């Protein structure tokens, strides 16, 4: 059985045992989370009101920072060049189960 969850403005396809990186969430490593699925698939597909009683149980594994991404700006003819960098914070969560 798998589920589609939404967190941090993004959607993820998860099933029991998966470890995924999501946008930064509050909580320490080892904290439990209950996420509401948008869609549950498996033997039959369920969505909308049919998944209102389903819960995806997850556990916070770690907090970290992603790889550095460089942003460059350039304008020809005027010697305008800029380079900045960014590292996105993330939270790794492990899916413990899909219950409903």
Swiss-Prot record:
Source domain of life: Bacteria
GO BP terms, alphabetized: translation
Cystine crosslinks: none
Keyword Transmembrane set for record: no
InterPro entries named in the record: bL21-like, bL21-like_sf, Ribosomal_bL21
Any GO molecular function: structural constituent of ribosome
The keyword Methyltransferase is annotated on this UniProt entry: no
Keyword vocabulary terms for this entry: Ribonucleoprotein, Ribosomal protein, RNA-binding, rRNA-binding
Any one GO cellular component localisation term in the record: cytoplasm
Assembly and binders: Part of the 50S ribosomal subunit. Contacts protein L20.
PANTHER family: 50S RIBOSOMAL PROTEIN L21 (PTHR21349), LARGE RIBOSOMAL SUBUNIT PROTEIN BL21M (PTHR21349:SF0)
Role noted for this protein: This protein binds to 23S rRNA in the presence of protein L20.
Similarity comment: Belongs to the bacterial ribosomal protein bL21 family.
Protein name per the record: Large ribosomal subunit protein bL21
